[in-house]
Swiss-Prot record:
Peptide chain release factor 1 directs the termination of translation in response to the peptide chain termination codons UAG and UAA. PROSITE patterns: RF_PROK_I (PS00745). The gene is prfA. InterPro entries: PCRF, Pep_chain_release_fac_I, Pep_chain_release_fac_I_sf, Prokaryotic/Mito_RF, RF-1. This is Peptide chain release factor 1. Keywords: Cytoplasm, Methylation, Protein biosynthesis.
Length: 361
């Protein structure tokens, strides 16, 4: 670990002690918002403190074993203990480095998943459906819940567009690097000549806005339309205009919801999505500017960026943001087995962040 990273760890340890002192202050205890904020920060620093304490114990074990090495009768045992302590210190060094990576406060939260067919006609809609099913099955494996908020089915299967809310701890942390353009190469079911077609779909991963996050939305900037729902709810929804479409005129963002029986419930859901979209747009601008400055690929949040190609003839998936990231496991991945792919992206992002931290004072 570099001296710069070690200094940052020491600063975090000092901050933990400071937080423990602050949280015993009656003025802080009496202020619910401040107490909650500081308590959350302290809980995030606990893993760092625990790892540092374990590192100190491993260093003490190493020193004891090295002292015993001079004793001929204890040398063999000492060598074993030295090797074990050194291996543990290497593990802790990597663990502490990963704990230094700034934690995104949205990582534990829910998200909105949007999949839209791009170029390629019917095949693009079918591919969009395949992508949505891939994410839905991955979510099921994680124990998350997927709630479709709106959809527009394709004429021959799949979706022209589908929007869903994914609910589960850590959902955003695992799927946040999926935003972008996904391209597929395969022979469509409707292709009689056996020719390979290329089509595309776009994916957007938008973190659900926290209740404490503030964004001012002027009611005068909203255009609200009602229409008859074609979604869940049976015959009732087709007899009343319960579905809601909200347009934020200044930004052009449009959201709709038709899954609930009541217009009021659909409006509440639509407003949550609108708030999330507007907050995400602000963050995306900042992330894109930072990524351009730092020349990052993973985590840039650019939805126009082609991030991945699914080549069915070769059974291959290539992620274009990470050099050499090609997996020959397409059948399992498209069925929701995303752990290996997501793990590589998270590792790359962590490496980028550690490089940035090492370069900063």
């Amino acid at each position: 670990m570099t001296p710069t990273l070690r200094r940052k760890l020491e600063a975090l340890a000092e901050r933990r002690e400071e937080l423990q002192h602050l949280l015993s202050d009656p003025d802080v205890v009496g202020n619910n918002d401040t107490f909650r904020t500081l308590s959350r920060e302290l809980s995030q620093l606990e893993p760092v403190a625990m790892a540092l304490e374990e590192e100190a114990r491993a260093k003490a074990d190493l020193a004891t074993a090295e002292a015993l090495r001079n004793d001929p009768e204890m040398r063999e045992l000492a060598e074993e203990e030295i090797a074990a302590a050194q291996a543990r210190l290497e593990q802790l060094d990597a663990q502490l480095a990963s704990l230094l990576v700034p934690r995104d406060p949205r990582d534990d939260g829910n998200l909105f998943l949007e999949v839209r067919a791009g170029t390629g006609g019917d095949e693009a809609a079918i591919f969009a459906g395949d992508l949505f099913r891939m994410y839905a099955r991955y979510a099921e494996r994680q124990g998350w819940k997927v709630e479709i908020e709106s959809d527009s089915p394709g004429e021959h299967g799949g979706y022209k567009e589908v929007v869903a809310r994914v609910v589960g701890r850590g959902a955003y942390s695992r799927l946040k690097f999926e935003s972008g353009t996904h391209r597929v190469q395969r022979v469509p079911a409707t292709e009689s000549q056996g020719r390979i077609h290329t089509s595309a779909a776009t994916v957007a991963i938008i973190p659900e806005a926290d209740d404490v996050e503030e964004i001012t939305i002027n009611p005068a900037d909203l255009k609200v339309d009602t229409f008859r729902s074609s979604g869940a709810g049976g015959q009732h929804v087709n007899k009343t205009e319960s579905a809601i479409r909200i347009t934020h005129v200044p930004s052009g963002v449009v959201v709709e919801c038709q899954t609930e029986r009541s217009q009021h419930a659909n409006r509440d859901k639509a407003m949550k999505r609108l708030k999330a979209q507007l907050l995400d747009a602000e963050r995306s601008k900042a992330a894109a500017a930072e990524a351009q400055t730092r020349k990052l690929q993973v985590g840039s949040g650019d939805r126009s960026q082609r991030i991945r190609t699914y080549s069915f003839p070769q059974g291959r998936i290539t992620d274009h943001r990470v050099e050499g990231l090609t997996l020959y496991d397409l059948p399992n991945i498209i069925e929701g087995d995303l752990d290996a792919l997501i793990g590589r992206l998270l590792h790359e992002h962590q490496a980028d962040e550690l490089a940035r931290l090492s370069d900063s004072p």
